[in-house]
Regions:
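Alpha-helical interface subdomain recognition
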Residues: 2-8, 12, 21, 27-170
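Carboxylate- and glycine-rich phosphate/diphosphate-binding segment that chelates Mg2+/Mn2+
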Residues: 18
């Protein structure tokens, strides 16, 4: 949605940037915000992995720790891989920004991948923790709620896909 303000008088000391640059400035501000959300989502995903790993090590079934069950080991491997992929993509976008390079598509990709990883890892943590992970106040339950918002604010995952497509396809 575009907004046009015609014949609007703004005192010179109240302008941010030059006339006509407002939309660009707003979008660049969002790029930085998206990078922050990506970092937040990486932290949530990492915490969800830690919560699941602790549960896998402490909980026992059939005389052995859950960490020894192949299917649960695969879940842990997938969680770790998603966390690390999100972390590396976020760091890459941050390096571009710090170097003064364009990073719009990379920031959106980092936010998309990290927020999707956070929700997935938090969901897996709830599943691994079982009924106790679903209880209100449980760490896994809180992480799941915290993860979900990262898919929404600073632009939904669908918006991030549109930005990425514009960046890579034109």
């Amino acid at each position: 949605c575009e907004l046009f303000l015609r014949n609007l008088c703004i005192p010179a000391d109240r302008l941010i940037g030059r006339p006509g640059d407002g939309f660009r400035i707003a979008m660049e501000t969002l790029d930085g915000g998206r990078l922050g959300i990506a970092a937040q989502a990486v932290g949530i995903a990492d915490a969800a992995f830690d919560e699941a790993r602790a549960r896998l090590k402490e909980r026992r079934q059939f005389g052995r720790a859950l960490e020894h069950f192949q299917g649960l080991r695969w879940k842990a491997a997938d969680m770790w891989a998603k966390v690390e992929a999100a972390r590396q993509l976020t760091l890459h976008a941050a390096r571009l920004r710090d170097g003064g390079e364009r990073f719009r598509a990379e920031a959106s990709a980092a936010k998309l991948v990290a927020s999707e990883a956070a929700v997935w890892c938090a969901s897996e943590a709830v599943q691994i923790c079982g009924g106790s992970g679903y209880l209100q106040g449980a760490v896994a339950e809180r992480l799941y709620r915290d993860a979900k918002i990262t898919q929404i604010y600073e632009g939904t995952s669908e918006v991030q896909r549109m930005i990425i497509a514009s960046g890579v396809l034109g």
